[in-house]
Amino acid sequence: MENERKGAGSHLRRASRFRSYDRESSGSPAVTSRGSDRAEQPLAVNELELLKPVSRSFYLSIRLLPRTLREPVALAYLLARTSDTIADSNAMPAEKRIELLDRFARAIAGKDQSIGKALKDLLLSKQDGSQSSSRSRGTKTPQDLSSGITEGEKALLESAEKILRALKNLSPEDQRDVRELLAIITRGQREDLTRWSGGLAALANAQELLDYTHLVAGCVGEFWTRVCFRKVQSFTARLEADMLELGTNYGRGLQLVNILRDAGSDLRAGRCYFPEDELRAADLSASDLLDAPAAFLPIYSRWIAEARAGLDAGLEYAIAINPARVRVATVLPAMIGVRTLSLLEESGLDALRTRVKVPRSEVRGMIASTTITLASQSRLRRARAQL
C-alpha cells in the first residue's frame, strides 16, 4: 500500500509539471478567447471548492481547464448539481420538489430573485428529516444519509445565491450557453419526478432511455463543444457538426455508466431506467430486478455495450482536440467510465446489490497516465484501439 501511495505521488508530481507547462495566462498560445466574449470578472464563488465534494471525476477534469473555459463549465455543473439536489430531496413530496425545481430554473433564467430563502428552507427540512429519522432509530446522524444531505450538497444549497450571482459575471455568450443548457437539464429532472411519482416503473423503450440521457447529459456534450468552438483558438480541425454529434454521444455514454452503476439504488428508490419492452421480452418486470434474476443479465450487458460505444465516441472526440490541456480534461471522464464498465462486467448482477466504484488509488493513476502518457493524440488512438 505504501509503495502504491509513493507511486501515485510520483506520478502526480510529474502531472503538476505538465500543468505548469500550460499555465493560465492571457498570453497562453493554447487557449485564448475569441468572438465577442468580454473578459470575465472574478467569480463570486470558489467553484473548485464546491465541486470537489460532489463530483470527484468532474473536479479533476475542471482543474485542468484554463480559466476562460473553467468558469462557464464549472458554474454550469454547479447549477446542474444544485438542481439535482433539489430533485433528489426525499424530505419533500414530489409536488413540492417540482415547484422548487421550477423556481430554481426561473432563477437561472434571471426571473426569480428570492430563491435563496426557499433553498434554505429545503436545507432545514432535509436536516430535520435526517435528525428525526436518526432519533427514531436511536442512532447518531452520520455525515451522509440517503434520506438526508451530504456536506457537499449542503454547501451547494447554501451557496446557491452566490452561484447565481457568479453566472451574471460571465460574458453574455457564456450566460446564454449556460442558461440554455440548464433549461434542458431541469426539464429532464422535472420529467424524472413526474414519471416516477406513482411507484416503481420502467421506461417504455430504448428511445425513451436515449431521450432521457440526452436531456440530462447528451446536452452537456453539446454545451462543451459550443463553448470550446467559441472560446478556443484552433480547437479542432473537424467540423462543428461532427464534434456536436460525438459530444452528444459521449455525454449519453457517461450517463449510461451512471445508470448502470446506480441501477440497484435506483430500483430500491422506485426508478427503473431499463426499457420495459426489453424486460417484457425476457418475461421480467421492473420489480423482478430487485432480485437480480439471471434473465436480466443479457439486457444489462447490452446497455454496458451501449455505454461503451458512447465512451468510444468520447475518445474519438478527445483525439480530435488540438490543445493538450483541453484534450486531457475532456478524456479523463471517459477513462474513468471505461474502468467503471469493466468493474461492472466483472461484478455482473452483483452490481445491483453492491455499488461499484473505481478506487481512489486507480483514479489517481488515471490522472497521472492521462496527463503524462495520453496527452499525445497518437497514444490516445492506441488506447482507443485497445478498448
Regions of interest found by a model, annotated:
Residues 2-7, 11-254, 260-387:
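Catalytic cores of Mg2+-dependent Asp-rich isoprenoid enzymes
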